[in-house]
C-alpha cells in the first residue's frame, strides 16, 4: 500500500501564487507604512494569516472527502508556515504554506479484529486491506499500528499514513483550488491590514 509508510518525515507545501503576490507588492506596502517600524511585516503577515485560514478551509473540505480522516484531525495536524525575511541585498523572501508530519495509521479507517489482524483504509475510495505483519501495540505511552521489519520480533516500526501537505499536493485540482483561495483572500485583506496598522488597531 503506497499510502502506508514507516517514514516519519515532516512534509510541507508552499502557496506559490500568494507568495508571488505578497512579494511583488511588499515594496508598496513598505512605502505606505514607512513611518511605522515593522508595519509592513505586520500588515503582510496578518493578510497571509487570513489567506492561510481560508486556504485551510478549502483544503480540509477536499481532503476529508478523499481521505478517511476527520476534519478535527486534519486541522490539528496542519500547521501554518508564515515567515517574512529581508536578505542582505534588500530583497524580501516569504515562506508561506502548510507543514505537517505523517499521521499514525490508527487515525485513519483502521480496525483490529479479535484475532489481532489489522485492516486499514487510508483513502475513502480504496478497498480495506489486511496488513499481514502489522499489529496494535503500546510503545511507551503511545498506542499505534506497528510492523515487524523481518522474521524476528524486533526491530519494530510504527506505520503511518500521509501527512496533510502530501494529501494536498498529491491532487493537482485540490492544490489549484487552495492556491486560488489563498491568493484571492490575500488580495482582499491586504488593504484592510494596511489600514489597521496605520490606525494602530489591534496593537
Report each predicted region and the residues it spans:
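Short, Lys/Arg-rich flexible segments
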Residues: 2-203
Amino acid at each position: 500500500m503506497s499510502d502506508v509508510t514507516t517514514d516519519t518525515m515532516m512534509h510541507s507545501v508552499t502557496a506559490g501564487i500568494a507568495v508571488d503576490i505578497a512579494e511583488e507588492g511588499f515594496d508598496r506596502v513598505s512605502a505606505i507604512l514607512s513611518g511605522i517600524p515593522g508595519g509592513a511585516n505586520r500588515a503582510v503577515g496578518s493578510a497571509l494569516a487570513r489567506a492561510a485560514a481560508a486556504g485551510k478551509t478549502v483544503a480540509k473540505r477536499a481532503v476529508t472527502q478523499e481521505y478517511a480522516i476527520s476534519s478535527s484531525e486534519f486541522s490539528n495536524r496542519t500547521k501554518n508556515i508564515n515567515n517574512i525575511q529581508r536578505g542582505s541585498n534588500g530583497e524580501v523572501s516569504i515562506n508561506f504554506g502548510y507543514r505537517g508530519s505523517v499521521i499514525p495509521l490508527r487515525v485513519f479507517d483502521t480496525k483490529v479484529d479479535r484475532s489481532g489482524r489489522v485492516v486499514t483504509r487510508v483513502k475513502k475510495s480504496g478497498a480495506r486491506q489486511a496488513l499481514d505483519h502489522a499489529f496494535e501495540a503500546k510503545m511507551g505511552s503511545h498506542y499505534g499500528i506497528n510492523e515487524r521489519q523481518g522474521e524476528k520480533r524486533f526491530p519494530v516500526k510504527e506505520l503511518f499514513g500521509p501527512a496533510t501537505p502530501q494529501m494536498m499536493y498529491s491532487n493537482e485540482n485540490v492544490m489549484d483550488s487552495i492556491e486560488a483561495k489563498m491568493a484571492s483572500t490575500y488580495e482582499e485583506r491586504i488593504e484592510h491590514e494596511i489600514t489597521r496598522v496605520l490606525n494602530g488597531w489591534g496593537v
